């Protein structure tokens, strides 16, 4: 059974993501985005084996301020935040293996 991803909003982003003690992967997505739906099962599967990183979702249509603040121009965009800063960005639908790979991912 896949894990459930927590939804964050413009109002909860700072507390849930920027002030988190562990790294947080934020999935910037939208309902109408086919590739976003394509990667959702991979992200949910990763949460089952997690513990080292938290994975959350932010709907850009409902929460445009945070997406704009971090320059999200296309979706899906996955940003990893650590200590309040973006430490890794993945743009586009990537296979699960690429999502698990440490270090920067080519765009």
Curated annotation (Swiss-Prot):
Disulphides: 33-36
Organism: Streptomyces clavuligerus
GO CC, one annotated term: cytosol
Keyword Nucleotidyltransferase part of the UniProt annotation: no
One Gene Ontology biological process: cell redox homeostasis
UniProt keyword list: Disulfide bond, Electron transport, Redox-active center, Transport
Ranges for domain Thioredoxin: 2-107
Residue ranges the record marks as coiled coil: none
GO molecular function: protein-disulfide reductase activity
Summary of the function given for this chain in its UniProt record: Component of the thioredoxin-thioredoxin reductase system. Participates in various redox reactions through the reversible oxidation of its active center dithiol to a disulfide and catalyzes dithiol-disulfide exchange reactions.
CDD domains (alphabetical): TRX_family
Family matches, as Pfam families: Thioredoxin (PF00085)
Record-given protein name: Thioredoxin
Family from the record: Belongs to the thioredoxin family.
Matches recorded under InterPro entries: Thioredoxin, Thioredoxin-like_sf, Thioredoxin_CS, Thioredoxin_domain
